[in-house]
Amino acid sequence: MMAKNNKTTEAKMSKKRAASEESDVEEDEDKLLSVDGLIDAEASESDEDDDEYESAVEEKESSSDKEAQDDSDDDSDAELNKLLAEEEGDEEEDYDSSEFSDDTTSLTDRLSGVKLQTIVDPNIYSKYADGSDRIIKPEINPVYDSDDSDAETQNTIGNIPLSAYDEMPHIGYDINGKRIMRPAKGSALDQLLDSIELPEGWTGLLDKNSGSSLNLTKEELELISKIQRNEQTDDSINPYEPLIDWFTRHEEVMPLTAVPEPKRRFVPSKNEAKRVMKIVRAIREGRIIPPKKLKEMKEKEKTENYQYDLWGDSTETNDHVMHLRAPKLPPPTNEESYNPPEEYLLSPEEKEAWENTEYSERERNFVPQKYSALRKVPGYGESIRERFERSLDLYLAPRVRKNKLNIDPNSLIPELPSPKDLRPFPIRCSTIYAGHKGKVRTLSIDPSGLWLATGSDDGTVRVWEILTGREVYRTTLIDDEENPDDHIECIEWNPDANNGILAVAVGENIHLIVPPIFGYDIENNGKTKIEDGFGYDTFGTVKKSNLEVNENGDGDEDGENESAKNAVKKQVAQWNKPSQKQLEKDICITISCKKTVKKLSWHRKGDYFVTVQPDSGNTSVLIHQVSKHLTQSPFKKSKGIIMDAKFHPFKPQLFVCSQRYVRIYDLSQQILVKKLLPGARWLSKIDIHPRGDNLIASSFDKRVLWHDLDLASTPYKTLRYHEKAVRSVNFHKKLPLFSSAADDGTIHVFHATVYDDMMKNPMIVPLKKLTGHKVINSLGVLDAIWHPREAWLFSAGADNTARLWTT
């Protein structure tokens, strides 16, 4: 046995020596050959993966060698003997091969026996804790289209916020239950620098897995920049790929296939016939119901099982074209309540009067009664009668359908410019001329625009300096003891600024005054012009009135009564020299008329002025000439009560305003030119636009009427905005403004643009409502007048004051 064991040990030793010699020979050959550049075609892994794979293979081989050694120790003697016999045979073969081997073999002969091992299975095997095999697969390299939404997160805290770990050194746990420690934070200075100079890819968010700031990678930043520049995000996509013309743009002449149509396309289909017959049988048997019949069945079922919804919304049906619905009954009022307020209950006297009234004349068919509870209310006894009368009304009374006009109210309002764009115009009261003891009925402004004259019921005429409000002149023209009923009705400056004549209408007299406020030259010119008329009779001239206006406009009466025309007429007014007492009051001349003079207006040249006496009949309108001391009555008879009269601004025309009409007369041709129909009940005053083609009129029935003389005789605009009678209307001589004053104590200022284009209508824009005068005894603003040049307005009121309104 010992010998046997020695043999086996020697055999093993020899085998080890042979293995070591072979390994040395292989190493030398590897050094000489250096086959590092040979790569297996099937191996596609990286160098690191190959190293890991080789280490794993070596571990596996070593483990298998150990297992083989353990098993060989336990083999039986027979197996050992068999192995020894095989080893001896191998040694003999090796000895024979080595003995006859030739050292001069070529390199190619040596490489021909070399075999390269290829990796077929890319998986790496390891052991689990229980000893079973564990496959470690290589890491997956994700491509662009891959999705990592289901990837496992490193931090497994779930929905717990990171703020729960603020006081702990860790931020969560991984999948193995180990703590994930909080990353180290820099100093306060580092944090400040990081907040000032933001790092590249900064988002301001925290990474839940690591607890550090979550920054964008270069690839993500590049992707965002490409999206901002509207560029292609995937480089693998070519936006300019060559066009594949699926359908040729050239029209082919010959067909692609010229196969003739088969016969089955012209023969009725048997399959379709079977399907149609199947449907027909189903309809006959009632298994298929046509839509029309099904609809009728549903309607019939609906009518049979109809249940009225008492609380449902009422559905309106479309009426016939000729059908008119009955008007709805008015809803009940408070007096029809079972518990009405006390003021709705009738007193015994009212109840007795209601019972004595005829049924058809009663305002209501019942007497309001009060009950403590609704259950105590009896039945209404007049219900049958009311229903019967309503049926009679619906049956006998005709009804007409009135179509409602769907008009937008805003479309009816004209588009007017803003008042801010139409300045200047008066907006405030700057001066109050106080001093009169009675109502200031009239006022007038000097042509130079420096002096304001006012006339009051206290019998005085005062002249004020406009800018300072100082009274510079005063004269008393009415003696209350002699003429208690007279008033200063009208006052008007001469339009010629070189004479300073002031005409004042006091009762039946007209005084021409030259106030001593202008200086010697102007005062002398005015007095000289008045005194020149006294010498008119001295030179033998005859006072004739050759002005007679034919109101009918006919030429038939021109040849009649020529002698009567040339004859001397009876004087309608008398020019009197002033007395010594009147000279002390600066009165230069007095014109005595028959009746009270209400209105006075100068001609633009300053030689003529017209007066109105409403109660004087056919001599209501008189035209006076200062240079000749001549008074003429242009009309044979009066048509209505004359309220006002004015000259045209530049034409020889006279505007005469009666209570209801405005007539325009041509003084040169002595005919009636036009008759205006304002439509008001009682006109009070008129004024003509400086251009002469428009006229405004005021009325006591609270209206202001604008007439365009180039259009119809009816008003172009009728303005109703005053609450009481309108006393005065005036145009500005230079600016596109006009005003209206009324007894409600207000003055309305308007912008009025008159265009040169005859196709354009005047534009009227309300600007300002001026309030300041007090209403006394239902009298407010009695007169108003504009400054000759500035946008200033003067007003006279019943509160004994005159006011200046400026911008």
UniProtKB/Swiss-Prot annotation:
WD repeats lie at residues 435-474, 483-523, 592-634, 637-675, 678-717, 721-760, 776-807. Residues 265-383 are annotated as: Required for interaction with NOP7. It is found in: Nucleus, Nucleolus; Nucleus, Nucleoplasm. The gene is ERB1. Residues 21-30, 42-56, 86-102 have a biased composition (Acidic residues). PROSITE patterns: WD_REPEATS_1, WD_REPEATS_2, WD_REPEATS_REGION. Component of the NOP7 complex, composed of ERB1, NOP7 and YTM1. The complex is held together by ERB1, which interacts with NOP7 via its N-terminal domain and with YTM1 via a high-affinity interaction between the seven-bladed beta-propeller domains of the 2 proteins. The NOP7 complex associates with the 66S pre-ribosome. Belongs to the WD repeat BOP1/ERB1 family. InterPro entries: BOP1/Erb1, BOP1_N_dom, WD40/YVTN_repeat-like_dom_sf, WD40_repeat_CS, WD40_repeat_dom_sf, WD40_rpt. Residues 383-419 are annotated as: Required for interaction with YTM1. Residues 1-112 are annotated as: Disordered. GO terms for molecular function: ribonucleoprotein complex binding. Residues 57-69 have a biased composition (Basic and acidic residues). Component of the NOP7 complex, which is required for maturation of the 25S and 5.8S ribosomal RNAs and formation of the 60S ribosome. GO terms for cellular component: nucleoplasm; PeBoW complex; preribosome, large subunit precursor. GO terms for biological process: maturation of 5.8S rRNA from tricistronic rRNA transcript (SSU-rRNA, 5.8S rRNA, LSU-rRNA); maturation of LSU-rRNA from tricistronic rRNA transcript (SSU-rRNA, 5.8S rRNA, LSU-rRNA). This is Ribosome biogenesis protein ERB1. There is a cross-link at residue 127 (Glycyl lysine isopeptide (Lys-Gly) (interchain with G-Cter in ubiquitin)). The modification Phosphoserine is found at residues 23, 72, 76, 146, 149, 418. It holds the Pfam family WD40. Keywords: Isopeptide bond, Nucleus, Phosphoprotein, Repeat, Ribosome biogenesis, rRNA processing, Ubl conjugation, WD repeat.
